[in-house]
Amino acid sequence: MWAFPELPLPLLVNLFGSLLGFVATVTLIPAFRSHFIAARLCGQDLNKLSRQQIPESQGVICGAVFLIILFCFIPFPFLNCFVEEQCKAFPHHEFVALIGALLAICCMIFLGFADDVLNLRWRHKLLLPTAASLPLLMVYFTNFGNTTIVVPKPFRWILGLHLDLGILYYVYMGLLAVFCTNAINILAGINGLEAGQSLVISASIIVFNLVELEGDYRDDHVFSLYFMIPFFFTTLGLLYHNWYPSQVFVGDTFCYFAGMTFAVVGILGHFSKTMLLFFIPQVFNFLYSLPQLLHAIPCPRHRIPRLNPKTGKLEMSYSKFKTKNLSFLGTFILKVAERLQLVTVHRGESEDGAFTECNNMTLINLLLKIFGPIHERNLTLLLLLLQILSSAVTFSIRYQLVRLFYDV
C-alpha cells in the first residue's frame, strides 16, 4: 500500500493559498465577463443553437491567479534562512529554479494571450513555446547541467549503461515544452475538454509526487507540488465555468499556460519521461492529426465535431477537397488510414470534378466514428475517462513494467 508522508509547512501554506486561488478564480471570471465582451474577446459556441456571445481567453484570469499565488509563496520554502542559526547557506539553486520556472510560465501566459488577441498562424504557435522555454533551459544548465541518461536494458549491449546526449538533451527538453503546450491545444473544441484533461493530468502528477516523497528525489517532487497544487485548484475554478454548457472559453492562453506548467515540473522535477506517459491520449491525437497538421491531407480551420440540430448530438466533421489536389503522400496515407478503419472516406462527383471527403483526423472525431453521435457533455466525459485510464496505465508502466527496462 502507498503511504503519503507528512507534508512540510511550505506545502501546507501552498495548499491554503491554492484553496484561496480556487475561490478567486470562480469569483473573478464572471466579474470580468463584461470587460472581455467589451474588448471583443468573445465568440459563439459553434456546437450550440444559441448565438450568445461567450467570453474567450479566460485562461489569462486563471493564469494570473496562479502567478499571484506563487509570487506570494516565494518566501515560504526559504523560511529557515530568515533565522540565521537555522540556515548554513542559502539554497540559491532552489531559488533560481523557482524564479526561472515562474518566468517561463509567465512568458507563456503573455504569449498565449497575444495569440488569442492576434490570432497567430501555426508556425508562430511553434515559435512561442520555444522562446518561452529558454529561461527554463538556462536554469537547467546552470543548476544541473546533467545530460547523461540511463540506457534501457535492451540497448545496453550497443550503447552501454550511460549515454551523454550533450546538446541533444536540451533539444529534447525544448521539444518537450513545444509539445506540451500544443498537445492540449490540438485536443480541444468541446466544452470542458481543455481544462478537464489538464485537471486530470495535474491530479495524476500530484499523486505521483506524493508517492515519491519518500524516495531519493524528495526535493524534486516537493518542487513539482509547489506548482501542481495551485494549478489544480485554479484550473478547477476555470472548469466550473467552462463545463457544459460553457459560460466561458479558456482560449489558447490556458492551453499554453497548462502545457508550460507541465513542462516546467517535468524538466526541473526530473521526471520528463513519466510526464510524457501522462500525455498518452495527447500523443495519440498528435500522431493521428499529423497528416492534416502537415497538410498532406487538407486541414480546415476548425476540426471540431458538428452539431446535429435534430438530435442535439455531435457528429463527425469532414474535410472536403478535390481528389486531384491530393498529393501522392496524402493519397497513400488516406488509403492506409481507411484500410485500418481510422477514417471514414466518401468519394463522389460534382460540377468541379471528382471530390473526396474524409472525417477530420482528431481523437474526438475518432471516438464519434467508433461510438456514433454523442451528446457534447457525454463526449467530454468519455474523453476525460480515457485520460484517467491512461493515467492508470502510466502508473502501471512506471511502477511495474519499468522493471523490464531499468534496474529499480
Curated annotation (Swiss-Prot):
> Which residues bind UDP-N-acetyl-alpha-D-glucosamine per the record?
Q44, D45, L46, E56, N191, R301, H302, R303
Where on the tree of life does the source sit, at the highest rank? Eukaryota
Q: Which GO terms describe its cellular component?
A: endoplasmic reticulum membrane; membrane
**What GO MF annotations does this protein's record show?**
glycosyltransferase activity; identical protein binding; metal ion binding; UDP-N-acetylglucosamine-dolichyl-phosphate N-acetylglucosaminephosphotransferase activity; UDP-N-acetylglucosamine-lysosomal-enzyme N-acetylglucosaminephosphotransferase activity
Pathway listed for it is: Protein modification; protein glycosylation
Q: Which catalytic reaction applies to this protein?
A: a di-trans,poly-cis-dolichyl phosphate + UDP-N-acetyl-alpha-D-glucosamine = an N-acetyl-alpha-D-glucosaminyl-diphospho-di-trans,poly-cis-dolichol + UMP
The free-text function statement in the UniProt record for this protein reads: UDP-N-acetylglucosamine--dolichyl-phosphate N-acetylglucosaminephosphotransferase that operates in the biosynthetic pathway of dolichol-linked oligosaccharides, the glycan precursors employed in protein asparagine (N)-glycosylation. The assembly of dolichol-linked oligosaccharides begins on the cytosolic side of the endoplasmic reticulum membrane and finishes in its lumen. The sequential addition of sugars to dolichol pyrophosphate produces dolichol-linked oligosaccharides containing fourteen sugars, including two GlcNAcs, nine mannoses and three glucoses.
- PANTHER family per the UniProt record, alphabetical: UDP-N-ACETYLGLUCOSAMINE--DOLICHYL-PHOSPHATE N-ACETYLGLUCOSAMINEPHOSPHOTRANSFERASE
Output this protein's name. UDP-N-acetylglucosamine--dolichyl-phosphate N-acetylglucosaminephosphotransferase
The gene behind this protein is DPAGT1
